[in-house]
């Protein structure tokens, strides 16, 4: 089959070469963006006098018919026409005749595909921002329910200090708030129009790039045609931002997987977000959390893949850039699905408050409170740390906890101890007293909830 670009060729590629070089099996996802860009391009060609009114009307009518077919999923694509651009051009010519070939005036597939991806990512990033906000809303709701649910905070996966479970949930809210801000900021670099850059050097036709940018909703145009067709930093930024979101989700996945185990029993996932075993009848596996943790590696891989592709490319377009899309599509699907799953999973999970509270009483996470108690009475903190460490060792030897020690043992360690030490050892009191800004104290959590809600308003 003769290629639309085949004028200078005496031979056509072998079928397997066509199949290897074709991208239509994945870039067909850009069909609506490609048609949208073409409609704007046709309007501009008309405004600039390159197409007359009748030609422009006929072309746009044909494009709109193709758009309706695309929305109804009625378009049939062919490897013979390589990619989304040539497939749609062939369909347009079939629809309106040779006039369809005029649409490509003053345009290359190089600026065309870059325009498609800018349009695509603009829509997808806005959707992802909405999904992040929805998940944040659920985190705030869960936090509000558990402001006074006492929970062991960890360092090194060892119980460290008692905290509010709300404080833990809100930690992820603020991580996601930064993630959302990064996506919002990236829109400034996504909303740039490469349309009209041509293959690499612009065009001799009297086009109006600002006009097509306005029609397509872009904020401004690429100032350099070489840059406009050859860089993919806007995709790399998207993949990087997505990697950070997935990293944050993966950390929470790891905690959920631990928390719902028999060893912790801090939470129970709703049945709709767990699966069973084909062999072991008793199993309830946190598969969704495990899948998101695993899919994080896919997103990292997509970022590293495109970075590796880009690092050795001279200006401007190279066929290597055909490999920029599948990772982008995969990342969009992965991050959107992960956020939707997480929103439901956190919303429906059961928090075992009594188990959490018991965990803070059957450990030494209140040891810092004892050291602070002595320091507030004038003892150097390092000396207090040493004394409390020895008290913890005594407890370990006797199989008890600090709250079980007789008062005489405390006074033997230091005459600064008074009877109120047992109140200090209460995990609830320990949490309540953490009143520093950003801390786990209940008043601070209420302030944090107000700030979080303001961010979502």
From Swiss-Prot:
* Keyword Lyase on entry: yes
Q: Give the matching SUPFAM superfamilies.
A: L-aspartase-like (SSF48557)
Q: Which reaction does it catalyse?
A: 2-(N(omega)-L-arginino)succinate = fumarate + L-arginine
For this protein, the record's PROSITE patterns field holds:
FUMARATE_LYASES
Q: Which domain of life does this protein belong to? A: Bacteria
UniProt KW keywords: Amino-acid biosynthesis, Arginine biosynthesis, Cytoplasm, Lyase
> InterPro entries in the record, alphabetically?
Arg_succ_lyase_C (IPR029419), Argininosuccinate_lyase (IPR009049), Fumarase/histidase_N (IPR024083), Fumarate_lyase_CS (IPR020557), Fumarate_lyase_fam (IPR000362), Fumarate_lyase_N (IPR022761), L-Aspartase-like (IPR008948)
Name listed for the protein in its UniProt record: Argininosuccinate lyase
Species lineage: Bacteria, Bacillati, Bacillota, Bacilli, Bacillales
């Amino acid at each position: 089959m003769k290629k639309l670009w085949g004028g200078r060729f005496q031979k056509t590629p072998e079928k397997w070469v066509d199949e290897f070089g074709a991208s239509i099996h994945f870039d067909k996802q850009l069909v609506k963006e490609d048609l949208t860009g073409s409609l704007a391009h046709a309007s501009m060609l008309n405004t600039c006098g390159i197409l007359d009114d009748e030609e422009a009307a006929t072309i746009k009518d044909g494009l709109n018919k193709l758009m309706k077919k695309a929305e109804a999923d009625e378009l049939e694509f062919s490897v013979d026409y390589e990619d989304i651009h040539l497939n749609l051009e062939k369909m347009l010519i079939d629809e309106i005749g040779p006039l369809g070939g005029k649409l490509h005036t003053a345009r290359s597939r190089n600026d065309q595909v870059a325009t498609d991806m800018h349009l695509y990512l603009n829509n997808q990033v806005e959707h992802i921002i909405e999904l992040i906000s929805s998940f944040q809303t659920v985190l705030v709701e869960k936090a509000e329910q558990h402001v006074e649910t006492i929970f062991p905070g960890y360092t090194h996966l060892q119980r460290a200090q008692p905290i509010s479970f709300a404080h833990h949930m809100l930690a992820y809210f603020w991580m996601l708030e930064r993630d959302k801000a990064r996506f919002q900021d990236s829109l400034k670099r996504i909303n740039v129009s490469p349309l009209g850059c041509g293959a690499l050097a612009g065009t001799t036709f009297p086009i109006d790039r600002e006009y097509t940018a306005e029609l397509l909703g872009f904020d401004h145009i690429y100032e350099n045609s070489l840059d406009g067709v050859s860089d993919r930093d806007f995709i790399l930024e998207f993949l990087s931002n997505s990697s950070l979101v997935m990293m944050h989700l993966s950390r929470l996945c790891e905690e959920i997987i631990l928390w719902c185990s028999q060893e912790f029993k801090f939470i129970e996932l709703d049945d709709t977000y767990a699966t069973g075993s084909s062999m072991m009848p008793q199993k309830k596996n946190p598969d969704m959390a495990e899948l998101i943790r695993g899919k994080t590696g896919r997103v990292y891989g997509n970022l590293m893949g495109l970075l590796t592709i880009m690092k050795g490319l001279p200006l401007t377009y190279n066929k290597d850039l055909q490999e920029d899309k599948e990772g982008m599509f995969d990342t969009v699907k992965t991050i959107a699905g992960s956020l939707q799953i997480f929103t439901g999973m956190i919303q429906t999970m059961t928090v075992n408050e009594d188990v959490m509270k018991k965990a803070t009483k059957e450990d030494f996470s209140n040891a810092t409170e004892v050291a602070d108690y002595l320091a507030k009475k004038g003892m150097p903190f390092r000396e207090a740390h040493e004394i409390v460490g020895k008290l913890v060792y005594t407890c370990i030897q006797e199989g008890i906890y600090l709250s079980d020690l007789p008062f005489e043992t405390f006074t033997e360690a230091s005459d600064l101890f008074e009877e109120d030490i047992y109140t200090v050892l209460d995990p609830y009191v320990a949490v309540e007293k953490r009143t520093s800004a950003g801390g786990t104290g209940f008043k601070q959590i209420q302030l944090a909830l107000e700030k979080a809600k303001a961010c979502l308003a």
